[in-house]
Regions:
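Cysteine-centered catalytic environments shared across enzyme families
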Residues: 1-173, 185, 189, 372-373, ...
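Short, solvent-exposed loop/turn segments at secondary-structure junctions
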Residues: 2-3, 107-108, 131-133, 160, ...
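Adenosyl-5′-phosphate
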Residues: 6-10, 15, 32-42, 51-53, ...
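Extreme N-terminus nucleophile/cap motif
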Residues: 15, 22, 228, 241, ...
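Active-site catalytic pocket residues across diverse enzymes, especially alpha/beta-hydrolases
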Residues: 116-120, 216, 353
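Short low-complexity, flexible loop/linker segments enriched in glycine and/or proline
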Residues: 167-171, 193, 215-217, 394-396
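Acceptor-substrate binding/catalytic loop of class I
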Residues: 175-179
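Active-site adenylate/phosphate-handling loop in enzymes that bind or generate adenylated species
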Residues: 187-245, 316, 321-345
């Protein structure tokens, strides 16, 4: 912001970008929250000449081009996945410093760690959890580390630590990202940096191999494809008066929509009515299609799961997953490497057909088959959890709830956010009348960002390095 001011750029808040953030939980590229500032998009370069506007050119255009499995070739295709992933991990292990690995209770990070230990028998793995029961992958991660023979280190985060770290975390983010998982990631990166300088992690596997449960939605909605558009529209209208949470309401509503209308990533938590209540400048013309229409235009004719994956590469992955991974690790001077996002791995994953990614009972089908010889059985078919965060419970009692009320009361962002409406939402959540945790978190992170970078009423205390420093 200081540089923007020196350059004379317009740093007023961009209301449209704020609305996009509230819907998506991140600010989509190339937008920023400042009207006069834009970002160079991932996969692009800019040519700047005197007295000319910047010329932006995209050099990377990922495509999903499914190639069906010929009879008798299934195992060969699974072996191809294994081989290319083994090669990627080997390349990412090359370093003049010690390399470790993040290890949750899921298949992706476990696969990376299991392959990495072949190159470093002294591999250290790291995981994090919370004091609250039910919000920890620690036991599964410990069992996985033991199964592959890795030394394992765990960091358990208390509610007090969680709250105290928030200003520093948002300061390092530079922009609001409303993913609660970035907090445990910050702590495990800090712990890992005491022992290693580089870590491998499992980001990207879900987007490449079809790992999100929502990717199964085209199967559950397949019957709607046989109905005339007018009938689907009638069913959609019929769903509107049904009470929220009523069985079948969401199915009827989503089945009445096209893929482009209903799917814009993993993050939606606000309805339009809730957005109107929270955003004084809510504009119904500012929709997710501002972000997604051009991306969907590139994938016409692909199967629906491939189109969803492609959209997530350009939105969720680059706007949330990789931002939080990169910034939380670099905040602790730790280099993060992501073997699943190697171009050769993508080349293999992008050729998988629909039925090798999603079935009615599982996700990442081909990847699971390919990893059967590598990943311990207790992890192979385990449901996806990631780093679960207990914000729903902590926003109902304790230090995080107190911090939330204080953040709302002290905020000077009333021209951008309807603070009394947010206070009512927090009251409803606290009393158990509704689960507003993700909506509250989205707004609270923005308010904290605003307090740090615009109001300057919050000055984060930046921690000293948590690793030996040679003077």
């Amino acid at each position: 912001l200081d540089l923007a001011g020196v350059l004379g750029l317009d740093t007023d808040i961009d209301r449209r970008a704020l609305q996009h953030y509230t819907v998506l939980q991140y600010v989509p590229e190339p937008e920023t929250l400042h009207r006069g500032v834009r970002r160079l998009e991932s996969g692009c370069y800019a040519m700047i000449r005197p007295d000319c506007p910047p010329e932006v050119t995209r050099y990377f255009r990922p495509r999903f081009s499914a190639v069906g499995f010929a009879a008798g070739t299934e195992q060969a295709r699974y072996d191809e996945i294994t081989a290319v992933l083994e090669d990627s991990v080997a390349k990412h292990m090359r370093a003049d410093v010690t390399v470790g690995a993040f290890l949750s209770g899921g298949i992706d990070s476990t696969a990376i760690a299991a392959l990495a230990i072949r190159h470093n028998p002294n591999l250290i793995t790291f995981t994090t959890g919370f004091e609250r029961e039910g919000f920890s992958e620690v036991d599964v991660a410990v069992a996985s580390a033991e199964a592959i023979g890795a030394r394992h280190i765990t960091k358990v985060v208390s509610q007090s630590e969680f709250v105290a770290a928030l200003p520093e975390i948002v300061w390092y983010l530079d922009e609001p990202v409303a993913d609660p998982a970035l907090v445990p990631l910050f702590f495990i990166a800090r712990e890992a940096r005491k022992h290693v300088k580089v870590v491998l992690s499992g980001e990207g596997a879900d987007e490449l191999f079809g790992g999100y449960t929502i990717y199964r939605e085209p199967l559950s909605l397949r019957g709607f494809n046989y109905l005339p558009r007018s009938v689907r529209a009638t069913l959609g209208r019929a769903s509107q008066p049904l009470p929220e949470g009523m069985r079948g309401k969401s199915l009827l509503h989503r089945g009445s929509l096209t893929l482009e209308e209903r799917y814009y990533g993993n993050a939606r938590s606000f309805s339009d009515e809730q957005l109107r209540a929270v955003l004084p400048d809510f504009n119904p013309a500012w929709t997710h299609t501002d972000v997604t229409a051009a991306i969907y235009a590139q994938s016409r004719g692909w199967d629906p799961v491939a189109r969803m994956q492609h959209l997530d590469l350009f939105t969720w992955l680059r706007g949330d997953i990789l931002v939080k991974a990169d910034k939380m690790t670099m905040a602790n001077s730790l280099e993060l490497r992501v073997p699943f996002l190697d171009p050769e791995v993508f080349a293999v994953a992008s050729r998988l057909p629909f039925d090798q990614k999603i079935t009615r009972t599982t996700t990442k089908y081909a990847l699971r088959r390919a990893l059967e010889p590598i990943v311990p059985p207790h992890v192979l078919n385990r449901a996806k959890l990631g780093f679960p965060v207990p914000i729903r419970h902590w926003l109902r009692a304790g230090e995080l709830m107190d911090w939330a009320y204080g953040t709302i009361e002290r905020s000077a962002a009333g021209g951008l956010i309807n603070l009394p409406a947010v206070r009512i939402m927090l009251d409803e959540h606290r009393l158990g009348g509704a689960d507003h945790s993700r909506r509250l978190w989205t707004v609270l992170i923005f308010l904290l960002w605003y307090a740090i970078f615009v109001e300057r009423s919050v000055v984060p205390k930046i921690s000293e390095p948590h690793y030996p420093v040679r003077l």
